[in-house]
A protein has these predicted regions:
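A polyampholytic, Gly/Pro-enriched intrinsically disordered region
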Residues: 122-128
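A short, basic-hydrophobic beta/loop patch
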Residues: 68-121
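Short alpha-helix boundary/capping and kink motifs at helix termini
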Residues: 2, 13, 22-84, 94-95
């Protein structure tokens, strides 16, 4: 097995949103975040069993050839956390034992994410 370090790229602001406060960027513990995500309807089961189409499988194809990804976007909601983008990538990396990821979050939730899900790790290691 080969050790891959994933390089995270921030998502640029969408057209018309350039003047808004930029997203917060945090390092989170995958296990902690997954526990909060399990309580929501959008949770992707291990193996991608309830994922959308072939999105889960396409993540594997991507990481076979690449060592980078756009950051996921998540928000804290009443039920736990929800992804605005990246839930299939998160599930696939979770299932491969990645322990930490870099995530984009609303700036007003940045400290909550750090407090609830933060980690001292600063690398996303994928054994491929």
């Amino acid at each position: 097995m080969r050790r891959k370090i994933i390089e995270w790229h921030p998502n640029p602001a969408a057209e018309g949103w350039e003047q808004t406060e930029p997203d917060g960027v945090v390092w989170v513990d995958v296990t902690k975040l997954d526990a909060a995500w399990q309580r929501t309807e959008q949770y992707v089961l291990p193996g991608g069993a309830n994922g959308q189409g072939s999105r889960y499988e396409r993540v594997e194809q991507w990481f076979e050839e690449n060592c980078y990804s756009n950051m996921f976007f998540a928000v804290i909601c009443d039920d736990g956390i929800e992804f605005g983008e990246g839930r299939h990538r998160f599930a696939w990396l979770r299932d491969r034992g990645v322990e930490a990821i870099q995530l984009q979050v609303p700036s007003d939730q940045e400290h909550h994410f750090i407090f609830q899900f933060g980690t001292e790790l600063r690398e996303s290691v994928l054994m491929a």
